[in-house]
Amino acid sequence: MNHKEILDQLVPIVIEQTPRGERAYDIYSRLLQDRIVLLGSPIDDHVANLIVAQLLFLESQDPDKDIYLYINSPGGSVTAGLAIYDTMQYIKPDVVTICMGQAASMGAILLAAGAPGKRYALPHSRIMIHQPLGGIQGQATDIIIHAEEIKRIKEMLIDILAKHTGQPKDKIANDIERDYFMSPYEAKDYGLIDKVIEKRE
């Protein structure tokens, strides 16, 4: 049994009473009814497709009502993360972002990409930004091509962070040279979030 199969067996089932009797949901489907989307894993193409599908579904249900994206992710694939990012910017509803645990790498970019004034973190979470990572093998010409692509992606991510934080691009470029960890309060000062929340208001 692989890791995913084990996790699938551990997903709680919620039983609800309806006029037609009992109805069982997995916990994620039940949260989706309340417009809550959970990003709680490394970001790969499969995870990104699930998140994007949920965002598009919730927009079709009600284009004027906020969507709540809870993030606890170490980051992952840049292209997969950018698929989520672009969808967040594309859809009509505001996407409220809430960091719990950690939002690192692409997770931090998605956190910052929430609707202005609606980006939050819980008090013991952590946020980390850094430059994109690349492990390339192959012929010298291919390595050069991939190195140029990594530089292009790095500039794109700097532009995105500058847009959502208000920080100068040269400061961001310097800060992401190495892993740059922040407490929620430091992330607020940096412009990655708008507020640290301890209790639901």
Curated annotation (Swiss-Prot):
Source organism, top-level taxon: Bacteria
PROSITE patterns (alphabetical): CLP_PROTEASE_HIS (PS00382), CLP_PROTEASE_SER (PS00381)
SUPFAM superfamilies assigned: ClpP/crotonase
Active site: S105 (nucleophile), H130
GO molecular function: ATP-dependent peptidase activity; ATPase binding; serine-type endopeptidase activity
Residue runs in coiled coils: none
Main localization (coarse): cytoplasm
EC number(s) stated in the UniProt entry for this protein: 3.4.21.92
Self-association state and partner proteins as the record states: Fourteen ClpP subunits assemble into 2 heptameric rings which stack back to back to give a disk-like structure with a central cavity, resembling the structure of eukaryotic proteasomes.
Similarity field: Belongs to the peptidase S14 family.
PANTHER family: ATP-DEPENDENT CLP PROTEASE PROTEOLYTIC SUBUNIT
Name of the protein described by the UniProt record: ATP-dependent Clp protease proteolytic subunit
Lineage: Bacteria, Pseudomonadati, Aquificota, Aquificia, Aquificales
Encoding gene per record: clpP
